[in-house]
From Swiss-Prot:
Organism: Shewanella piezotolerans (strain WP3 / JCM 13877)
Name of the featured protein: CinA-like protein
Disulfide bonds: none
Coiled-coil residues: none
PANTHER family reported in the protein's UniProt record: NICOTINAMIDE-NUCLEOTIDE AMIDOHYDROLASE PNCC, NMN AMIDOHYDROLASE-LIKE PROTEIN YFAY
Signal peptide region: none
SMART domains, alphabetized: MoCF_biosynth
Pfam families: CinA, MoCF_biosynth
Similarity-based family: Belongs to the CinA family.
């Protein structure tokens, strides 16, 4: 099955919004063993939409069209498809009744423009949208099935999972013997990872892919067929041997998700005292439901005064060593842990840039500490030539990895290929 995607909208084409739907879709389908082979972005111009529908329908088996199903004048997907097919738009009675009911239940008067959302090409199959006012539809043109979806992300994702996957599985039998494993890495560039793994001889049906999502690189091990799946453990063992400490999580979207799971399982508690990361540690954990079970507090102690008054950092420590130092960050972590007697506390203090660096402590210098009930671990890392946001996100990731290793009873401080440390 040859799958393609057409994304519509001037704001997407002009880069005014980031097309997260396309990235999510390609990843979702890959997990089902289907590769999206082409993606095209088209603006809100009727003739361009008609042309691309006609052209791609002769090459692809399935085309997902995203966007252009709203009630406004620049929502043109339905009209363009009808023109491409050479048939009229007709009102779908089921969806018209659904619209009437939706507006009545929500105590609103339906605008005349909303009636447009019940118009679909005459030969189209209506696709339900239980969470929005724009129905989807599927229509056959030339070789391809074109599957039209709303642009609103949560509507799009639900339609893909509940409607599109069953639709293509019924017609193309995509469900089969496929398996996907993901490994989240830290501290190694994509080319370095690829070089390290190039010695692996992959059996037929197994592929290795890479996806950069800073501060991590995700490695995907994909197998198709029973024979290939049976070889995955052996290939995974080679990946782990070659990459060593670079792998920080399995089948997780982020290191924060891994920490969340480990803290839930362990029953341990955590406090955070953040300076340069500015609450990023706490924020990433709080994005996961249930974090209240372990997160005692998240403190942004940005000024020296707050470090002293809130965390109990000694003024002489700041005078002698500075805010960005092993001594200061260790006292920050110890102070944060002591406030609520947490099992662990993470602390960060650094120079995220673009200014503020010195010869001894250039921009990208970050001190990180992990306080436990038995002691404190600390390191000061170098992150030169990174943006302010990347310095903060990398520092957060290193802090999380220190805690992860402590929770797994591993060495807390390890070497990373692209992240250097100051010697204590």
């Amino acid at each position: 099955m040859k799958l393609e995607m057409i994304c519509t909208g001037e704001e997407v084409l002009a880069g005014q919004i980031v097309d997260t739907n396309a990235a999510w879709f390609a990843n979702m389908l890959m997990e089902h063993g289907v590769e999206c082979q082409r993606r095209i972005t088209v603006g809100d111009r009727l003739e361009d939409l008609v042309a691309v529908f006609q052209e791609r329908s002769t090459e692809a088996d399935v085309i997902v069209v995203n966007g252009g199903l709203g009630p406004t004048s620049d929502d043109l997907s339905s009209e363009a498809m009808a023109l491409a097919k050479g048939e009229p738009l007709v009102e779908n009675k089921i969806w018209r009744d659904r619209l009437d009911d939706w507006f009545t239940r929500n105590g609103r008067v339906m605008a005349e423009s909303n009636l447009k959302q019940a118009l679909i090409p005459e030969s189209a199959i209506m696709i339900d949208n239980p969470v929005g006012t724009a129905c989807g539809f599927a229509v056959k043109l030339n070789r391809a099935w074109l599957f039209f979806t709303p642009g609103v992300p949560f509507e799009f994702k639900q339609m893909i999972k509940e409607q599109f996957i069953p639709f293509i599985n019924e017609r193309f039998e995509i469900a089969g013997d496929v398996a996907l494993r993901k490994y989240l890495t830290l501290g190694q560039g994509e080319s370095s990872l690829a070089d390290a793994l190039e010695t692996i001889v992959l059996p037929e049906g197994i592929t290795i892919g890479y996806r950069s999502s800073m501060p991590h690189i995700e490695i995907k091990l994909f197998a198709r067929g029973k024979a290939a799946i049976s070889e995955m453990d052996k290939i995974e063992a080679q990946i782990r041997f070659l990459l060593g400490t670079a792998i920080v999580a399995n089948n997780k979207k982020s290191l924060a998700e891994e920490i969340h799971a480990l803290l839930i399982d362990s029953g341990k508690t955590l406090s955070a005292a953040e300076s340069c990361t500015g609450g990023m540690i706490a924020s990433q954990l709080i994005s996961h439901a249930g974090s209240s079970a372990y997160l005692d507090q998240g403190l942004v102690t940005y000024s020296n005064e707050s470090k002293v008054k809130v965390l109990g950092v000694k003024p002489e420590t700041l005078d002698d060593h500075g805010a960005v130092s092993i001594a200061t960050v260790e006292e920050m972590a110890s102070g944060a842990r002591a406030i609520l007697n947490s099992d662990y506390a993470l602390a960060t203090s650094g120079i995220a840039g673009p200014t503020g660096g010195t010869e001894d402590k250039p921009v990208g210098t970050v001190a990180i500490a992990l306080a436990t009930k038995s002691g404190v671990y600390s390191q000061m890392i170098k992150l030169p030539r990174r943006s302010r946001d990347l310095v903060r996100s990398l520092s957060t990731a290193v802090a999380f990895d220190m805690l992860r290793r402590e929770l797994l009873d591993e060495a807390v401080i390890v070497d990373y290929g692209s992240i250097k440390r100051f010697q204590k």
